C-alpha cells in the first residue's frame, strides 16, 4: 500500500473537495483503470483484507473497540446505533406491493442523509480531542467508550434543521467530502437497490479517513501497520455489513448492477 499521511483536520481540508463525477464513457473508465487513484484504492482495500491473516489481533465481539483509534471508535458507535435502532424505528411497509425495494427504505436513507454530518463531526471531534491534541498512539478503553457513545448519540439524535450545511470553510470541505462517501455506502434511495458500488463507497470513505490520519497517530511517511488495520477490518467492516444485511433483508433492496463495481 502506498504511504498514507497522518495529519489533522486542517491538513485534510487543504486536500478536500466535494466529490465530482468524472466517469461517463468507456474511455473515461479505461483512464480510471490505469490511474493512481484506482491503484491506491485497490491497494488499500487489499491491504485491509490481508491484515486479518496471521495477525496477533484477536477480534472479540464483546469488546469491539479494542485496537481502534478514537475517531474510529466514534464511527463504530454510530454504526452500532444505526444497526440496532433504525430498522426497528422505520420498519418496512407491509402493505407495499412491490417486487423489489420497500418504499420505507426512502425514509431510512433520508435519516442517513439528515444525520450523516453529525456522525462525521463526532468522528473528527474525537480525533482532534484525543489524537491531535494529546499526540497519543494508544488510548484506554474509557476514552474509546466515550467516543463510541458520542458516535452513537450522533446517529440517534435528529439533526438540527437550522444548523448550516454545505459551507465552504476548510472544515466544511472535509465534512462535505466524507459525507458524500458515507451516504452513498448504503444503497440508492430512488432505485431502491444495493450493490458493489455502494460497498466500494464505504471503503472509499475508510480510505479517506486513513488519508487524513483518522486511523491513529502515526508518522506521515509510514503506512498503517497490520496491527492497526486488523481491528478496522474486523470491527468496523463487521458492523457495516450488519447494517447492509439488515436493509437488504428488511427492505428487500434490488441487487444493483450486473458488472461489478467497475
Predicted regions, residues:
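Polyanionic, low-complexity segments and short acidic motifs
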Residues: 38, 217-226
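N-terminal leader regions that mediate targeting or early regulatory function
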Residues: 1-184, 189-194, 198-199, 230, ...
Amino acid at each position: 500500500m502506498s504511504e498514507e499521511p497522518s495529519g489533522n483536520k486542517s491538513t485534510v481540508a487543504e486536500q478536500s473537495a466535494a466529490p465530482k463525477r468524472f466517469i461517463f464513457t468507456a474511455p473515461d473508465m479505461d483512464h480510471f483503470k490505469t490511474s493512481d487513484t484506482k491503484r491506491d484504492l485497490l491497494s488499500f482495500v487489499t491491504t485491509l483484507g490481508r491484515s486479518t491473516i496471521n495477525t496477533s489481533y484477536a477480534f472479540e465481539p464483546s469488546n469491539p473497540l479494542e485496537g481502534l483509534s478514537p475517531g474510529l471508535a466514534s464511527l463504530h458507535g454510530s454504526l452500532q446505533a444505526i444497526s440496532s435502532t433504525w430498522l426497528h424505528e422505520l420498519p418496512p411497509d407491509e402493505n407495499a406491493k412491490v417486487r423489489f425495494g420497500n418504499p420505507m427504505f426512502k425514509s431510512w436513507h433520508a435519516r442517513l442523509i439528515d444525520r450523516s454530518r453529525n456522525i462525521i463531526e463526532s468522528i473528527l471531534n474525537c480525533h482532534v480531542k484525543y489524537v491531535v491534541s494529546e499526540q497519543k498512539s494508544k488510548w484506554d478503553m474509557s476514552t474509546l467508550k466515550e467516543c463510541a457513545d458520542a458516535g452513537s448519540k450522533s446517529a440517534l439524535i435528529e439533526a438540527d434543521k437550522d444548523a448550516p450545511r454545505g459551507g465552504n470553510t476548510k472544515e466544511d470541505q472535509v465534512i462535505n467530502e466524507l459525507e458524500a462517501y458515507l451516504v452513498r455506502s448504503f444503497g440508492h434511495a430512488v432505485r431502491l437497490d444495493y450493490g458493489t458500488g455502494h460497498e466500494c463507497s464505504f471503503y472509499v470513505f475508510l480510505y479517506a479517513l486513513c488519508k487524513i490520519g483518522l486511523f491513529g497517530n502515526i508518522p506521515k511517511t509510514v503506512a498503517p501497520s497490520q496491527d492497526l488495520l486488523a481491528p478496522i477490518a474486523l470491527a468496523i467492516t463487521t458492523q457495516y455489513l450488519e447494517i447492509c444485511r439488515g436493509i437488504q433483508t428488511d427492505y428487500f433492496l434490488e441487487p444493483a448492477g450486473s458488472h461489478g463495481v467497475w
